Regions:
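Sec-dependent N-terminal signal peptides
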Residues: 4-14
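Kelch-like beta-propeller repeat domains
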Residues: 17-361
Length: 361
């Protein structure tokens, strides 16, 4: 764990508790993670088929390999831990022909048996770039890309290889559309592992996003930022109160204005909501508002290092990460937030473990 600095507004990034947590054995981004009973599990993304576990209850804390992922490696999936099993939903990976496609199979990992199992089920809507959380023993998911549009684009890219004019047309046709025409998923679905059944919880009152951050705490959902379309982020943030499979939504003030972020880290720290990091294209929002729908064309991706806290129903900047970072895993741990891995501005994955905690001084 890197040794960082005290930040203003009673926030601390450092090693006082996490000092014994070693770096991840491999650079890690676009993967999934979860925590149960002090044991942290991570896998997929840049780890390929590898999965690792670390038991933070032990005096000697070290990452150990667990059973390998048994099928197509993937990115932009989600993982939830329910009753001693890790459930992995969706994501994108290369099929047997080498074309990137959305993955529809569902796998569970039995922690006690160190064994993966393919489940006889499929999500009723496409899940990749979505968010998931646990409610009453069910895995709830929303957001993500449209399967037909997403798969169609990468199929066309593959077919156009070697023909630069056709490749340019494929990209122009795909990126030069308004956000609504990507049909991102705004259905809310719930999976019950005990029955191996899916349930329809309706739709969000806002357009679907991809790469949003999610927090579920005290029966309250927070969906923060994300992509409105490829290359264009959202500043919108929402909260929903979940009761008896019904959700009452309210919009929060915008966060990370004016561009928004996707792939940011989010968690509860000492009862407060935090959002950190994330990636965006500076200038894309202005270009889009001027009718340039391929809004990130010619722009460089930027990586935020800002840390925001939701204070009295408004977002306040309360500090900064040591460098811009996005697309890792964030988990609640010991009253703070762990940031596991991520991607920095050169596009490379990192092995860092960062701990954010309130400064009690």
């Amino acid at each position: 764990v890197k040794n960082f600095i005290y930040l203003p507004f009673c926030l601390f990034i450092g090693t006082s508790v996490a000092g014994a947590l070693p770096e991840i054995p491999e650079p890690f981004k676009y993967g999934v993670g979860g925590i149960e009973n002090g044991k942290i599990y991570i896998g997929l993304g840049s780890l390929g088929n590898n999965w690792y576990m670390i038991d933070t209850n032990q005096s000697e804390k070290k990452w150990t390999k667990i059973a390998q992922w048994p099928t197509v490696p993937r990115e932009q999936a989600t993982a939830t831990i329910i009753d001693g099993k890790i459930y992995v939903f969706g994501g994108i990976g290369k099929d047997k022909s080498g074309v990137i496609t959305l993955q529809k199979d569902v796998y569970s990992y039995d922690i006690a048996k160190d064994k993966w199992e393919k489940l006889m089920t499929r999500p009723p809507v496409s899940l990749a770039g979505h968010v998931s959380f646990i409610h009453n023993g069910h895995a709830v998911s929303t957001g993500g890309v449209n399967e037909n549009i997403f798969n169609g684009y990468f199929s066309d890219v593959e077919l156009s290889k070697g023909n630069s004019a056709l490749t340019e047309k494929v990209n122009r046709d795909y990126f030069s559309k308004p956000a609504d025409d990507y049909f991102l998923n705004n259905h809310i679905i719930s999976y019950d592992p005990s029955k191996n059944q899916w349930k329809n919880l309706g739709t969000t009152p806002f357009p679907g996003t991809a790469g949003s951050s999610v927090i579920f705490a005290e029966q309250q959902i927070y969906i923060l930022g994300g992509e409105r379309k490829p290359g264009l982020r959202s500043v919108r943030s929402w909260t929903g109160e979940l009761s008896h499979d019904r959700i009452k939504w309210s919009e929060l003030p915008p966060v990370a204005s004016p561009e928004g972020v996707s792939g940011a880290y989010a968690s509860v720290i000492d009862g407060n909501i935090f959002l950190a990091g994330g990636a965006y294209f500076p200038g894309a929002a202005e270009k889009y508002s001027n009718g340039e729908y391929w809004s990130h064309k010619g722009l460089d991706k930027a990586y935020s290092k800002e840390i925001y806290q939701l204070i009295k129903n408004d977002w306040k900047k309360v500090g900064s990460l040591p460098e811009g970072l996005a697309y890792g895993v964030s988990l609640p741990w010991q009253g703070g937030m762990l940031i596991l891995g991520g991607e920095k501005k050169d596009g490379k994955a990192v092995s860092d473990v960062i701990y954010l905690k309130k400064n009690d001084k």
